[in-house]
């Protein structure tokens, strides 16, 4: 590509669109982060940052967090709603509630809470969906508005703890997911002498589209039907506690890509709100739940990995619909609450790691088959001679398909014992030569060529063996085909010479990234600079801040990675605020009830039985170091 430029790199990896301005490519071809939007010229080179951490003893892979991105995401969402409220003359305020299930890491929750420390009236609360999460938010919510929303299934202990939260000075909304929870809440509130703040989760008929659409609709796991909601109202009236019902909640599902789905869901829920107000309920909070999407691929579309709207459009639609329907019913406008965790956290974290080796197709010269070879091999040689002689463009596809068919036949004949191993190897090499030659002759401008170009890019792609576990660090890429932006951290000032796929170091064939963000959408391979052990480069996996850490598992006993918190000072200096060591081998063994101390005793017994005395101390030391070591690969010398 003689016309390659930095702008071509930015467009090719679509960085400008998925990064929201937080990440970019410098004129030197290095990936940078701009964590503080107030100072966009203050950038950190991720490649140099990683090298500095390695020099300081932080082994790769390392998850790097940028708390200033969290601050910006919180404040930009609040600002979008504040502007919408002003635009439509809405008569109530907005509260952002962070559901800690998205990322419960202490640093993340504390930084989100700190993002509004300077505000006289913080627009921030916390959501819990389990007893452990509730215990956490009870100790943290006072750092913001002290509002806590309790979702999820509940037992008496959960409810009692939530009510104790009221005694601690919090404003705790207990959202009823099941009809049976009401009886428990009423009983525990009487025992504690605490008036509960109740919420209802409405099960809407409308169902948004997307990977998590089962969270909404009539068959959703959570929520109350219209009839059950009326039962709750009747029971509260009988107890003279209808004024305890203060919040209406619904959830369309995570990552709602289409703004029309959000608008339609809010419209239905708004009528629930107004009808309940007319029945005498004192509801004053309207909780739209999650659903605010993240544009992982930067296409601004309705795909599962994108969104066709921005923050202002999201806030405007919610506020506009509520304003109109409340005015129609002549009911007061409620406080708007959203639980937008993915939007807050996705961009703030990037996994940086090294490529430990590659496997690439190398062009090899082939000789014509022996005269007595099967006719099939002669047919393949003919395909090669035709293509190497620069066949007519119209014949390219036919020759390619013939070669593919011949290869399949050769493999079948080998399985039947009618081809030798050497003949099969020759057939495979001949096919690869044809594929390589065809790849160079096809044109993306020809629409009939494009499917074959994609097929050949995948077939001839280099394999990059990358020092990470897909199951630990990007579990959604494996579990639900979530797309995450991936790109080399340096060398992007030169045209990419290869296409590659990223394979992790687990012993699992599913440990492969098979979708990559591209300027045109999603591809099955990634354009990369040539890699070698003499001129290696690092890889970055972006937008991994939501759900990935807590969902990650220990397949092959690869544990948590090292992590670091990095910010940029007012003077532009990089500040590595803290480093948290990842799991050691002993740590992950303990998770599965294997005791490293017992193992050392066993090692000593085996060493004494089998190792010469002069070697014993060294061998035992290496075994002990192994137990204390990082679960990922470190030593390539």
Swiss-Prot record:
Pathway: Amine and polyamine biosynthesis; agmatine biosynthesis; agmatine from L-arginine: step 1/1
Keyword field contains Metal-binding: yes
Gene Ontology biological-process entries: arginine catabolic process; putrescine biosynthetic process from arginine; spermidine biosynthetic process
Listed cofactors: Mg(2+); pyridoxal 5'-phosphate
Chain residues that bind substrate: 286-296
Keywords on record: Decarboxylase, Lyase, Magnesium, Metal-binding, Polyamine biosynthesis, Pyridoxal phosphate, Spermidine biosynthesis
Catalytic activity: L-arginine + H(+) = agmatine + CO2
Residue numbers carrying N6-(pyridoxal phosphate)lysine: 101
Keyword Ion transport included in the entry's annotation: no
InterPro entries per UniProt: Ala_racemase/Decarboxylase_C (IPR009006), Arg_decarb_HB (IPR040634), Arg_decarbox_C (IPR041128), Arg_decrbxlase (IPR002985), De-COase2_N (IPR022644), Orn/DAP/Arg_de-COase (IPR000183), PLP-binding_barrel (IPR029066)
Family: Belongs to the Orn/Lys/Arg decarboxylase class-II family. SpeA subfamily.
Name of this protein: Biosynthetic arginine decarboxylase
Annotated gene: speA
């Amino acid at each position: 590509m003689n016309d390659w430029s930095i702008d071509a790199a930015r467009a090719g990896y679509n960085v400008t669109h998925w990064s929201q301005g937080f990440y970019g490519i410098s004129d030197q071809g290095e990936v940078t982060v701009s964590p503080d939007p107030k100072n966009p010229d203050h950038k950190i080179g991720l490649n140099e940052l990683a090298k500095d951490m390695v020099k300081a003893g932080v082994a790769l892979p390392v998850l790097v967090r940028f708390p200033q991105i969290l601050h910006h995401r919180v404040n930009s969402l609040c600002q979008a709603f504040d502007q919408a409220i002003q635009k439509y003359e809405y008569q109530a305020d907005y509260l952002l509630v962070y559901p800690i299930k998205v990322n419960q890491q202490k640093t993340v929750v504390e930084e989100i809470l700190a993002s509004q420390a300077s505000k006289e009236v913080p627009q921030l609360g916390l959501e819990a969906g389990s007893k452990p999460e509730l215990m956490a938010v009870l100790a943290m919510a006072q750092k913001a508005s002290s509002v806590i929303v309790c979702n999820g299934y509940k037992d008496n202990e959960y409810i009692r703890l939530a009510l104790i939260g009221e005694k601690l000075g919090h404003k705790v909304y207990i959202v009823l997911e099941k009809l049976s929870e009401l009886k428990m809440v009423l009983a525990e509130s009487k025992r504690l002498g605490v008036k509960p703040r109740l919420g209802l989760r409405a099960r809407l008929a409308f169902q948004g589209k997307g990977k998590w659409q089962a969270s909404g609709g009539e068959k959703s796991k959570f929520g109350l039907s219209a009839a059950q909601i009326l039962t709750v109202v009747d029971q509260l009236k009988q107890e003279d506690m209808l004024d305890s019902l203060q919040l209406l909640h619904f959830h369309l599902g995570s990552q709602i890509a289409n703004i029309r789905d959000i608008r339609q869901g809010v419209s239905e829920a708004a009528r629930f709100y107004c009808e309940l107000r007319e029945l005498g309920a004192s509801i004053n909070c309207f909780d739209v739940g999650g659903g605010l999407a993240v544009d992982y691929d930067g296409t601004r579309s309705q795909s599962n990995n994108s969104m066709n709207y921005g923050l202002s459009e999201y806030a405007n639609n919610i506020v506009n619909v509520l304003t109109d329907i409340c005015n129609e019913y002549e009911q007061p406008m409620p406080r708007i609450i959203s639980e937008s965790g993915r939007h807050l956290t996705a961009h703030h974290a990037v996994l940086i790691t090294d490529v430990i080796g590659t496997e690439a197709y190398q062009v090899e010269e082939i000789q014509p088959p022996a005269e007595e070879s099967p006719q099939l091999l002669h047919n393949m040689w003919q395909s090669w001679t035709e293509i190497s002689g620069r066949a007519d463009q119209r014949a390219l596809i036919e020759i390619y398909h013939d070669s593919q068919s011949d290869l399949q036949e050769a493999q079948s004949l080998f399985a039947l014992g009618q081809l030798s191993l050497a003949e099969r190897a020759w057939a495979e090499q001949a096919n690869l030569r044809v594929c390589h030659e065809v790849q160079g002759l096809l044109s993306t401008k020809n629409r009939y060529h494009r499917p074959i170009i994609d097929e050949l890019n995948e077939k001839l792609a280099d394999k990059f063996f990358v020092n990470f576990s897909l199951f630990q660090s990007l579990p959604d890429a494996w579990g639900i085909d979530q797309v995450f932006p991936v790109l080399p951290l340096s060398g992007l000032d030169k045209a990419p010479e290869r296409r590659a796929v990223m394979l992790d170091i687990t012993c699992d064939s599913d440990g492969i990234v098979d979708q990559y963000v591209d300027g045109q959408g999603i591809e099955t391979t990634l354009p990369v600079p040539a890699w070698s052990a003499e001129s290696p480069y690092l890889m970055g996996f972006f937008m991994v801040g939501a759900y990935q850490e807590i969902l990650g598992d220990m397949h092959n006993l690869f544990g948590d990675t090292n992590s670091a918190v990095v910010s940029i000072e007012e003077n532009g200096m990089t500040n590595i605020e803290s480093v948290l060591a990842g799991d050691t081998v002993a740590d992950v063994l303990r998770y599965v009830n294997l005791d490293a101390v017992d193992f050392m005793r066993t090692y000593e017994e085996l060493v004494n039985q089998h190792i010469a005395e002069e070697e014993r101390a060294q061998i035992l030391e290496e075994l002990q170091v192994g137990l204390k070591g990082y679960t990922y690969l470190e030593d390539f010398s």
